[in-house]
Amino acid sequence: MLKDGKAYAYAAWAVAETEGKVPQYVKRQCQSWINIVDDKDPDAVVDERAYQKICKLMQLMVHPDLHCSIYEGLEDYAWLFITATLCTKCRDADERYYITALLEIARKNFKTFNSAVIFIVLMLTEPAFSRFFSVAPDLSLSSELKLAIRKIIKSSPALIDEVDPAFKILRSQIICKLNDNEYTPLAYSQDTMDGKLANAFLADEAGALDDYPVEAMRSSQITLRNKLGIIISTQYPNDNNVMIDEID
């Protein structure tokens, strides 16, 4: 059950923590999610079937650095981030409750890697012909997500079977052959963000972006029922960036 997992345990620890390690707004968000899991929220519930499916997929994915399953190697905070994002549903509809997943965290905490796990799960489970994008200040940074996805796929025999691989990795995109879902990295400095239809998108290092890339991605999702935007960043020494707007 979800209550027995690392996501719920981490949320409970964050709420109870008294040494100043957890910011107050994180505590409030964790308490809000605990209320959902405990069936105390009038608008949202957790989907146990979706949770079980995600756990099985993570058991198939191999961590490229730890050489164990993603299920075993994932950090506790990442379990909460991924589980809350993908398994929290609207009570009156089979749609994700959260349409934005926001993560501000210090460097070297695997935020792009954890986003890659979410993207692989989505590419395997979303409806056929779904499209996914990452946006960042330049193509090199935007392609960090592609690199992380590629490393996980290449390390996971179940995903890269020589006879019938689940994914096709191209220079400019990654395609899930099971359903023709595709992921493409975009660069704010080179690519127009308009005219895309993003079932899900990642804004990486949002502290170095203005609001145009995120708003363009969101505009592309207007007609979609089950949409998701993941916005991640460390802190940047400027007052004009989309991360500050999202936190506010």
Question: Where in this protein do the model-derived segments appear?
Answer:
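Phosphate/NTP-binding elements of NTP-utilizing enzymes
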Residues: 1-248
